[in-house]
């Protein structure tokens, strides 16, 4: 779940001037499993609905032709269509690797470049490194937990730079935040709720 760091190497000492952080996108095992389950379930519900409408068994399991079309077969058809559309959407996100990208801290140019793949186009944000005041770790526990690394910027909202998904382990989050703060020579702000 953690982002991979790599320091560029060239004849000059670029580890002091360039830091790249690769951010993983939507190509995760859990997304493949959910998209596959939705596809199978959606097709199954649609076939059960068609079986109840035409009175023939289109599924090898059960006996869906005995279902009354209104309301059981009709609702199964709606659920099947909805699940199939959501599955197609998830497969599209997986195909383009939505959310993947690169955080590139370049001291030579004095620019932080944050690039992410969107559904239809790539998003690129460039910020002067001098505008970065601190690296901030945000941790929120509870029903909807959030663990992420953000950059506190001068005159702007905080910019999240860690990957989206399940919460990262705290140790990994702290190590990544410390690596960035050390590279930028700024403060690492604590865990805020």
Curated annotation (Swiss-Prot):
Transmembrane segments: 32-54, 69-91
Pfam families in UniProt: Ycf4
GO terms classed as biological process: photosynthesis
Keyword Oxidoreductase assigned: no
Key words of the record: Membrane, Photosynthesis, Thylakoid, Transmembrane, Transmembrane helix
Subcellular location: Cellular thylakoid membrane
Membrane disposition: Multi-pass membrane protein
Cellular component, GO annotation: photosystem I; plasma membrane-derived thylakoid membrane
Annotated family: Belongs to the Ycf4 family.
Reported function: Seems to be required for the assembly of the photosystem I complex.
Listed name of the protein: Photosystem I assembly protein Ycf4
């Amino acid at each position: 779940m953690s982002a991979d760091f790599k320091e560029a190497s060239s004849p000059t000492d670029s580890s002091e001037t360039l830091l790249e952080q690769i951010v993983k996108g939507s190509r995760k095992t859990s997304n493949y499993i959910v998209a596959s389950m939705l596809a199978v379930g959606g097709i199954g519900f649609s076939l059960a609905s068609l079986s109840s409408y035409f009175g023939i068994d289109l599924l090898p399991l059960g006996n869906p032709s005995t279902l009354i079309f209104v309301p059981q077969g009709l609702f199964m058809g709606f659920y099947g269509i909805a699940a199939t559309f959501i599955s197609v959407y998830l497969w599209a996100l997986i195909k383009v690797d939505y959310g993947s990208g690169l955080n590139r801290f370049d001291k030579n140019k004095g620019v932080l470049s944050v690039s992410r793949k969107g559904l239809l186009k790539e998003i690129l944000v460039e910020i002067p490194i001098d505008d970065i005041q601190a690296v901030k770790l945000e941790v929120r526990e509870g029903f909807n937990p959030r663990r992420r690394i953000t950059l506190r910027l001068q005159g702007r909202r905080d910019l999240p730079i860690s990957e989206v998904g399940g919460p990262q382990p705290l140790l990994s989050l702290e190590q990544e935040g410390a690596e960035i703060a050390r590279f930028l020579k700024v403060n690492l702000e604590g865990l805020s709720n």
